[in-house]
Every structure is written in C-alpha cells, then in structure tokens.
C-alpha cells in the first residue's frame, strides 16, 4: 500500500490543496506577529544613543552622554534573553496544549509589554533603564513564543508544493517590521526636530537636548503594540491545525470538521486509520530513538541558526556604530540629539530598503524552486565573501569618498542573510520533525539562534571597540576593532556553510510526514513493523 493511501485524507487534502484565501489569511495573521517582533527587537538600536544623551549627558563633557557599557549591553540584549526563554517555553507549550491555545498569549504579552516599555518612568536614570529592561525582557518572552508557533502553524496549514514560500512570507514580514521601525523613527525625529529645534552639542551642550526628546523614544517603543492589536481577533479565530488535532490530540473528527470548513470540501473521518498510524509514536525528545532519527538534524538546525544570528544581530543592533566608525554618520558632538536619531534611522532605513527587505522576498519567490539547502549554502557563502570584502581593505573604506561603496557592500551582507540562512533556518525546523515535537524542536533551534544573537549583541558591543585606548568610548576597554570583528563574523558564516553542508536536509516538495519519518511509521505499521528508510536518509525502525 502506498504512502498516500496510508496518510489521513485530511492531511492529503492539505498537502494537495490549491493556494486559497485561507493561506493568505494565515500569512497575514502570523506575519503581523513577525512584523511586530522585528519592530520591537530592532527599534531599540535606533534610540539607544538618544537614551544616552537624555539620561547620561554631562554638559561639562566635550562629548554627548552615552549609555554606560553595562546598561547599553542590558538595553540591547535583555529582549534577546527574554526571546530565548520564550522560544523554549512556548515551543514546548505549543506541543502540549496546541498551537492555537497558546498563540493568543504571546500576542497579548507583546501588546502589554510594548506599551509598558514606553511608560518606563522613575526618579533616576538607572531606575528608568531598569524598568525598561524589565518590560523588554517580558516583551522578548512573548516575541520568543511567536517563532515556533507561527512557523509550525504555517507549515501545518500549507500545501507541500508552496509550503516554503508560505513560511518564508510569514518570516519576510520581519523585514517590513525593521523598515517600519526606521521609517517611524525618521518621522518622529523629523517632526520633533521641526517643532523643537536645538543647536549642536558643541555649540550649546545643555540646549542640544530638548526636554520633549524624552517623548520620542517612548512613542516609538509603544507603537510596536499597534499591529499586534489589529490582528489579535483574527489570530483567535484561526482553528487548530489539523496535524496537531489528528496526530497529537488524536481527534480525527475535529480535524476533519475544521479543515472541511477551511478547504470547503467534504473530508472523511478516519478514526481507525488514525489509531493505526499513531500507534507506537510515543518516544520522547530525549530518547535514543529520537536521537537516532532526528538528532543530527536538530544539531544542524540549531547550530546553523546560532551561527547566522551571531552575525545578523551584531550587524543589525550596531549598524550605528559601524556607520560612525567609517564617518558616514557625523560625530555626535556636531549634532543635536534629534538630528543624530534622524541620521541613524535614515542610514538603517536605507540598508533595510535596499538589502534587508529584498533578500526576504527573493527567498519567498525562489525557495520552492531552488530549495532550502541551496539557498542556505548560497547565503552563508555570500555573507562570508562580502564580510571579507569589508574587512580586508577596511582602512580604505574609512577614507573620505569611499563610504558609499562600503554601505553598498554592507547592504549585500543583509541581502544574503535574508536570501539565505536568516530565512531558511526559520523554515527548515518547522518541516523536518514529528508533529508532536515540531514546535518544541523549532523552539530549541530558535533559542540556539537567540543564544548566538546574545553573543553577537553583547560581544560585538565590547569587541568592536578600537584597539587604541585614545579612541575607546567612555567606560569601555580596548577591543579588537571593527575590522577584526568583521573577520570573526565572516568566520562564523564560513562554519555555518560547513554545518549546513553536513547536517541540514532538503525538504522541498515533500510532505511534513515524509520529512519527519511519520510517513514511514505509517508504512511500517501497515507492513507489520518492517524497517523503512525515510526520505532524508535516516533509518526508521
């Protein structure tokens, strides 16, 4: 008996379904969560210099105030720590309680904490930063839950022909979130600058920071709640995925009923077949059986996500420092605080528009043609090449007149991150693990990525400091410099290329059950327990 005959009719119907309105609804509902995620995670990098000027400026100093090293590290990294925790917790919970049951929790947490972040008030600068960090941790916790849940829901709703494009489209909303963060910050800083003009710091230190600037960062952070609020109702209206209802909750009747409404077709209820194909699927995440079947793949998805995020987040969170080091953004003392915010956001918006967003959508359009494996290899190779192109002649790029080419090449590192491993590391873990462990394994892979992001955020902050003590920012020790930091990031990308080559399977055009080995379980069950080999080459016993 063939695999398709052994598969539940409801799952066959999903795999073979033509692209319909419910696919686009799912993309928008899940994608707006990622829009919010990216906006909230990356907009903080646009306002950290403003926070330093508002709360840590000494008018007697020749340079504007900046966040002390420990506070800068906390403000930039605390949301990532929360995200890591949320990915593990909600990934596990999504397999225990169901995808839909916990999907609303993450969005509510994001809404509440986005608003609360902007309401961080206290009597001292340190207390304001502590309150901000507290709410940004829990904001990150909610954001973390969106990773495994959105990826798993989209993979389980999609047909196998265009599944990669659908999951990639959800993730691509992250690019629009990054772009929106830049545009909102541009608009806010320009508007406040026009309403409350101020001189450059070197002209009048005290007057260069207007009191109204304190509203700017608060409004920017709170606006992150808006897209989440707009999609909450539709997120709650989505039915549970048929794969969870059938293969994990083992309720064939409910799965058939839900998907009959979604697909608008009659679907047979197959209680006996469900009992047959789910029999014996009780091995756990930490069992020898899981390690034999999926251990190498979990190592591959976790390791490659870790490596790409070391580079991607350090680049994203510290673009402002790189642009300052090559003199594309003027020295802080030559600007007022709102002009500095405007210039930083303009630079990051340009990078997002020209490199980040196009990369995501190249992945959407090509992933089901080229495949995940090749795109991930291409992306790691491109990031390695362009980072070496920036690092080797780095001193040349700091010379007047060369900054435009530097920014152009720098934009290509973002293009190949997003037309590459930043997107595919999100997609693959949602396709290759069993339904009852899919959300958990995606959460583990994503949390590994955030561990890399934390290393990138905290490590780059210190490592990129100049080697010359005379040019080190106040409160920091000499580091290895931006040039050597770029060499380190290029090395991470090269290792990611090798790990992809050895450990990451191709899932293009295959059903989730084929990739996870569940189809082979069904076939083995029908054949009286015979051994089979799954489509990715792992022996099934």
Swiss-Prot record:
Query: Which superkingdom?
Result: Eukaryota
Annotated region described as Disordered, given as residue ranges: 512-541
The UniProt entry lists membrane topology as: Multi-pass membrane protein
Q: Write out the GO cellular component annotations.
A: membrane
| Gene Ontology annotations of biological process type | phosphate ion transport
Sorted alphabetically, which Pfam families does this protein's record hold?
Answer: Sugar_tr
Where it sits in the cell: the answer is: Membrane
Matches recorded under InterPro entries: MFS_dom, MFS_sugar_transport-like, MFS_trans_sf, Phos_permease
Q: List all topological domains (Extracellular).
A: 48-70, 122-124, 185-213, 319-349, 396-403, 465-484
Name the protein family: Belongs to the major facilitator superfamily. Phosphate:H(+) symporter (TC 2.A.1.9) family.
Protein name in the entry: Probable inorganic phosphate transporter 1-12
Q: What is the lineage of its organism?
A: Eukaryota, Viridiplantae, Streptophyta, Embryophyta, Tracheophyta
Protein's gene: PHT1-12
């Amino acid at each position: 008996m063939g695999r398709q005959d052994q598969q539940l009719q409801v799952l066959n119907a999903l795999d073979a379904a033509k692209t319909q309105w419910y696919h686009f609804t799912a993309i928008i509902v899940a994608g707006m969560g990622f829009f919010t995620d990216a906006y909230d995670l990356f907009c903080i990098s646009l306002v950290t210099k403003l926070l330093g000027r508002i709360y840590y400026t000494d008018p007697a100093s020749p340079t504007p105030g900046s966040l002390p090293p420990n506070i800068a590290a906390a403000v930039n990294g605390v949301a990532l720590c929360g995200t890591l925790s949320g990915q593990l917790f909600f990934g596990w919970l999504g397999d225990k309680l169901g995808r839909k049951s916990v999907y609303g929790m993450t969005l509510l947490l994001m809404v509440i904490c986005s608003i609360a972040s902007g309401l961080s008030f206290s009597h001292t600068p340190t207390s304001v930063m502590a309150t901000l960090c507290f709410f940004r941790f829990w904001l990150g916790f909610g954001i973390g839950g969106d990773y495994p849940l959105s990826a798993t829901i989209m993979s389980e709703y999609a047909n196998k022909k265009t599944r990669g494009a659908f999951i990639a489209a959800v993730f691509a909303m992250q690019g629009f979130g990054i772009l929106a963060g830049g545009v909102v910050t541009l608009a806010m800083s320009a508007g406040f600058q026009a309403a409350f003009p101020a001189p450059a710091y070197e002209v009048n230190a005290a007057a260069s920071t207007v009191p109204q600037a304190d509203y700017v960062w608060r409004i920017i952070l709170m606006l992150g709640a808006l897209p989440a609020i707009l999609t909450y109702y539709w997120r709650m209206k989505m039915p549970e995925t048929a794969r969870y209802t059938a293969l994990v909750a083992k309720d064939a009747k409910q799965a058939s009923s839900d998907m009959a409404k979604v697909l608008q077709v009659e679907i047979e209820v197959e209680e006996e077949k469900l009992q047959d194909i789910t029999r014996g699927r009780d091995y756990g995440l930490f069992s020898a059986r899981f390690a034999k079947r999926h251990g190498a793949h979990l190592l591959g998805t976790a390791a490659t996500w870790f490596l790409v995020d070391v580079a991607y987040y350090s680049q994203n969170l510290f673009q402002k420092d790189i642009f300052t080091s090559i003199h594309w953004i003027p020295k802080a003392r030559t600007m007022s605080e709102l002009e500095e915010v405007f210039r930083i956001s303009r630079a990051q918006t340009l990078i997002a528009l020209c490199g980040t967003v196009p990369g995501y959508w190249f992945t959407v359009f090509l992933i089901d043609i080229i495949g995940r494996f090749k795109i991930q290899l291409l992306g790691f190779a491109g990031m390695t090449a362009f980072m070496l192109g920036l690092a080797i002649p780095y001193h040349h790029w700091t010379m007047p007149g060369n900054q435009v080419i530097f920014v152009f090449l720098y934009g290509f590192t973002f293009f190949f991150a997003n037309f590459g491993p930043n997107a595919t590391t999100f997609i693959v873990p949602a396709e290759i693990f069993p339904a009852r462990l899919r959300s958990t394994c995606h959460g583990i892979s994503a949390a590994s990525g955030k561990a890399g992001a934390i290393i990138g955020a905290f490590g780059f902050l210190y490592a990129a400091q100049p080697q010359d003590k005379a040019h080190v920012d106040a409160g920091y020790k000499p580091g290895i410099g931006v040039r050597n930091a770029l060499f380190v990031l290029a090395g991470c990308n090269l290792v990611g290329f090798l790990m992809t080559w050895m450990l990451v399977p191709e899932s293009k055009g295959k059903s989730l059950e084929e990739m996870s080995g569940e189809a082979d379980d069904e076939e083995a069950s029908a054949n009286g327990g015979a051994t089979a080999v799954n489509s990715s080459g792992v022996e099934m016993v």
